[in-house]
Amino acid sequence: MKIFFTNPPLRELHFSRSQRSPGVIKSGTMYYPYWLAHAAALAESRDHEIYLLDCPADFINRDGLLQQIEDQKPDLIVLDTSTPSINFDLQTVEKIRQITDAKILMVGTHVTSEWHHCLEACPALDFIAMGEYDFTVSELAESLESKSPIREIAGLAYRDQSNSGSLIQTDVRLPIEDMDELPWIAPIYKRFLTPENYLFTIASQPMIMLIGGRGCKAKCFYCVYPQVMHGHNYRTRSLPHLIGEMKWIEQNMPEIKEIVFED
């Protein structure tokens, strides 16, 4: 199955959606879409064809996104979300539905918390993957291909087409225990993204963003990720897995001057 992953636009703005406090930052800060990249890398490792488009970083507006979707002709479209952008995100889903019959899946912090409201508000939206969605995306693609029951996929919400459109939430998707199950994301960055379009102000440029693990014991008021996405139990990648990716960056992306760990 061909899966189109996108960090969608927010109007014409340079909107940094992946950071703890999403927004248009005066410094020009722009985070990598590392959550999407992990899901894309995993999907490719399971023999799906992937495409990743980061609209805010590449200054691509909604019309540009729609054109890319028409050009790529995906079977499944995965859109990231955030609370500041959600109204525009849902409008984007409606626009996408006008040009394709591909299934549309939303992921991220806002839809994880407000899945019921988002499905009710947007009839064009097919699915929501809640929490750590890496495996959910791939399992959904495989279920759609094989026409097997999607009710068995954990971490999913959707509209039941056989029961008057009632909304269904499947079992909770537990956080990934073995972080080495996730493939490296640096090769995904190299193929689909432009490092010069990302900025972390205290890092040398161009920089790249990785994670050493997921989960956080802290309860910072400005960060929803532990409560919504990855929980409070910190799970780390093994040193060989992590160092191997760093060496790959050194050898294959010599322009990178610094690696930022966004744990």
Task: Kindly give the residue locations of the regions a language model identified.
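Radical SAM [4Fe-4S] cluster-binding motif and immediate context
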Residues: 185-263
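A short, charged/proline- and glycine-enriched loop
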Residues: 1, 73, 205-206
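Conserved alpha-helical elements of sugar-nucleotide-dependent glycosyltransferases
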Residues: 28-38, 241
